[in-house]
């Protein structure tokens, strides 16, 4: 598939800590940049910020993962950023950032509204709070197990909205040779 114009993709997550969500965010940012697309990441700074910046991604150090009453203000900021930067896709990778993203997008006219993607990284508690992760135009499940979790616990989610994209290990950055002694 050839795109007529480069995409602008915004990823939302709590913080650039060291973990699978965060590492995946940096990898997606890198892949987007290498393919000529524009990557924007919105989250609180953390140990992977330098890695993210090396991808050429734009970084907004906003604490959108803090469970605090004032965090709601970031929904307006995300909305304004989507409009000013002409974001094509918003990809939420965690529940609180997803709530902020969903609220932000609900205030954008349909013709200017980015595509809404969520990734379910684990079997969250089944609750109204977690249900936001099922609100994506497309929902990425990181394994068949997670896909089954979604279909079992959220029967209203249409199967054609769920895409399974298994996580993997980059052998170039991880030593896969080990022994029992290690």
Language-model region placement:
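Membrane-interface segments of envelope glycosyltransferases acting on lipid-linked substrates or membrane lipids
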Residues: 1-182
């Amino acid at each position: 598939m050839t795109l007529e114009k480069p995409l602008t993709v915004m990823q939302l997550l709590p913080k650039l800590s060291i973990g699978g969500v965060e590492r995946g965010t940096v990898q997606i940012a890198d892949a987007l940049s290498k393919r000529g697309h524009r990557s924007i990441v919105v989250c609180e700074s953390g140990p992977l910020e330098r890695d993210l910046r090396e991808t050429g991604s734009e970084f907004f150090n906003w604490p959108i993962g803090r469970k605090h009453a004032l965090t709601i203000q970031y929904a307006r900021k995300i909305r304004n950023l989507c409009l000013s930067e002409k974001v094509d896709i918003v990809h939420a990778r965690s529940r609180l950032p997803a709530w902020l993203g969903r609220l932000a997008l609900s205030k954008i006219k349909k013709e200017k509204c980015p595509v809404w993607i969520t990734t379910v990284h684990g079997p969250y508690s089944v609750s109204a709070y977690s249900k936001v992760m099922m609100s994506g135009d497309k929902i990425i499940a990181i394994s068949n197990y997670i896909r089954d979790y979604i279909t079992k616990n959220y029967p209203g989610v249409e199967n054609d909205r769920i895409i399974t994209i298994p996580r993997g290990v980059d052998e170039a950055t991880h030593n896969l040779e080990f022994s029992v002694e290690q």
